[in-house]
Amino acid sequence: MIDTTLPLTDIHRHLDGNIRPQTILELGRQYNISLPAQSLETLIPHVQVIANEPDLVSFLTKLDWGVKVLASLDACRRVAFENIEDAARNGLRYVELRFSPGYMAMAHKLPVAGVVEAVIDGVREGCRTFGVQAKLIGIMSRTFGEAACQQELEAFLAHRDQITALDLAGDELGFPGSLFLSHFNRARDAGWHITVHAGEAAGPESIWQAIRELGAERIGHGVKAIEDRALMDFLAEQQIGIESCLTSNIQTSTVAELAAHPLKTFLEHGIRASINTDDPGVQGVDIIHEYTVAAPAAGLSREQIRQAQINGLEMAFLSAEEKRALREKVAAK
């Protein structure tokens, strides 16, 4: 189901949602951090989704053990490096890794700007080692409020040339986009792209707000767009992409079952939608699973899956020249 003549991308992938269970175990031992289990087999139910969670907020608690072991900037650097190694193992040629430095820093009160620098270093070294092309998206964790998001924004701005885009993630219902208008004004002034988690827990009005008020060029998840025909028309006409995450939307109970997922309808409507993982370490999936298992289960035809793969590159925060070079590099293999 994956077209090997085309670049394989993952443009909605949380770095802090892809910390290996084995790494959690090792860092826990290294820093004498009490974990809920002492073997890999018994730890996995605590750090991976075994049964679907009742809602998004419940799902997000599964990420907590991964960041609780980030007791130093070296630990942050390690998990960033391993994220690139995992991407290479999955056959990804290009990945956009997004991360919330405030969330990663929280358990051990690490300097937020230091976390950003450590992630940049780890990703850079991983790209050199494994030959993967990567860009970084800064996340503001709306769940922690406006002031915490401001701190994250300042940390990103201190490294503005290494950050490609700004995102807003977390509790969409409790912390609407309207609270963060000034943050996104500064992001646009910095020349960054904008992608926003919207229409996952909240309705289509959240997507409209992300586009009109925050300047979103892409929407993370965006499943509730299916409820608003005018919105779907607008997304298609304006080529505002939807970063679909199939398995994730089932595990968060955002969508009841894969057969009911709106990705197929989005593609039929001419919306530029792509296939992505979200939090692969927590979900226990990889991009290959999403293409070969989840996408067919969601009713996508072989041609629709190929179109979603094409869309992944077209939606990427790359220049036209970078996209062309990536296509040529894959075609030459």
Curated annotation (Swiss-Prot):
Molecular function per GO: 2'-deoxyadenosine deaminase activity; adenosine deaminase activity; zinc ion binding
Catalysed reactions, semicolon-separated: adenosine + H2O + H(+) = inosine + NH4(+); 2'-deoxyadenosine + H2O + H(+) = 2'-deoxyinosine + NH4(+)
Binding of substrate, residues: H14, D16, G170, D279
UniProt-listed Gene3D superfamilies: Metal-dependent hydrolases (3.20.20.140)
Cofactor: Zn(2+)
Residues flagged as site, Important for catalytic activity: H221
Keyword Nuclease found: no
GO cellular component: cytosol
Tree of life domain: Bacteria
Keyword Zinc annotated: yes
Cofactor note: Binds 1 zinc ion per subunit.
Catalytic site: E200 (proton donor)
InterPro entries in the cross-refs: A/AMP_deam_AS, A_deaminase, A_deaminase_dom, Ado/ade_deaminase, Metal_Hydrolase
PROSITE patterns found in the cross-reference section: A_DEAMINASE
GO biological process: adenosine catabolic process; hypoxanthine salvage; inosine biosynthetic process; nucleotide metabolic process; purine ribonucleoside monophosphate biosynthetic process
Keywords annotated in UniProt: Hydrolase, Metal-binding, Nucleotide metabolism, Zinc
Residues at which Zn(2+) binds: H12, H14, H197, D278
EC supergroup of this enzyme: hydrolase
EC number: 3.5.4.4
Similarity section: Belongs to the metallo-dependent hydrolases superfamily. Adenosine and AMP deaminases family. Adenosine deaminase subfamily.
Purpose of the protein: Catalyzes the hydrolytic deamination of adenosine and 2-deoxyadenosine.
Record protein name field: Adenosine deaminase
